[in-house]
Amino acid sequence: MPLVLFTGYPCSGKTTLAKHLVQLLQSKIDATPSLSKYSITYHSDESLGIKHSDYITSQDERKLRSEIISAVKRDLSKNKIVIVDSLNYIKGFRYQLHCEVKNLSTTFCVIQTLCPPETIFEWNKTSNPNPWEPELLNQLIQRYEEPNSSNRWDSPLFAILTPQDNITDYIDDICKVVFQTSKSAKNSGHNDPLSKGLQKPNSATVLKPASQSNFIQVLDIETSKIIKTIMNHIKSLTSIGGVSNGTRVIVSEGITDINDDGCFFVDLPIGNVVTLAQLQRLKRQFINFNKLRDIDQDRIGPLFADYLNKNLN
């Protein structure tokens, strides 16, 4: 049965999602008699004895990757779902795991947790019982190699924004991938109700970039409009000797009535002056977090304004 591979920054909510997924999949198995032969094995850094310090040097990292590979080889089988909850941030390693799955003619999916670095550092400080050293945490964020759904070893890819998404919203599509029949099962007439007709991942089972081929360009254009509006507001106040700190900037195009449901705005922080470099950095983060999500164009502006309000204040 499949390998479900979690990937993401440290302290981005992977373990919470992975354990919730175990519960949801087990509930599916318990509620579906024809799935009763399936079992779930969950592996994490903690269960495999991998410590934070093992990520410091490349030599130690090779050892921890060997631990994960060994666990997958040992446990992956026709009737066992293996969930790996680790950083898995090197694309070559994800490819290696994909090859192990392919050798068994079973299925595979990647679940990526997306989370703003500011939130990660806050969670690490306030909510993590075993916090990462800030310097190592920052290094691992810089090292991270983003999965790409166009690569077969990163597909099917489910990208989940942990501060606001819930894995229950994705569970039906994940189940369609997890419980699809393997080649051998197909030949033997296997007929699980959750896998019927799902021999290959398709648009119903995979979270892919939005339908527009230029979606990233659309994200860039819409977010750039908002940044331009904010910078023009700051410049206009500065030119007359005013102060932009603590002011509200309406960034909705063509709608200026604050009581209108279509109006959205950005509140500039009181304590410091917002710079173009700061806005561009937040824009890049926003695009990176949303490039795999299916967002209507008219929702990009309000979502980006909300993202700025959360990260500027």
UniProtKB/Swiss-Prot annotation:
GO BP: regulation of transcription by RNA polymerase II; tRNA wobble uridine modification
InterPro entries documented for this protein: KTI12/PSTK, P-loop_NTPase
Annotated ATP binding sites: 8-15
Keywords on record: ATP-binding, Cytoplasm, Nucleotide-binding, Nucleus, Transcription, Transcription regulation
Location in the cell: Cytoplasm; Nucleus
NAD keyword on record: no
Any single Pfam family the record assigns to this protein: KTI12
Gene Ontology molecular function terms on file: ATP binding; chromatin binding
Tree of life domain: Eukaryota
Family indicated by similarity: Belongs to the KTI12 family.
Protein name: Protein KTI12
The species this protein was found in: Saccharomyces cerevisiae (strain ATCC 204508 / S288c)
Native organism taxonomy: Eukaryota, Fungi, Dikarya, Ascomycota, Saccharomycotina
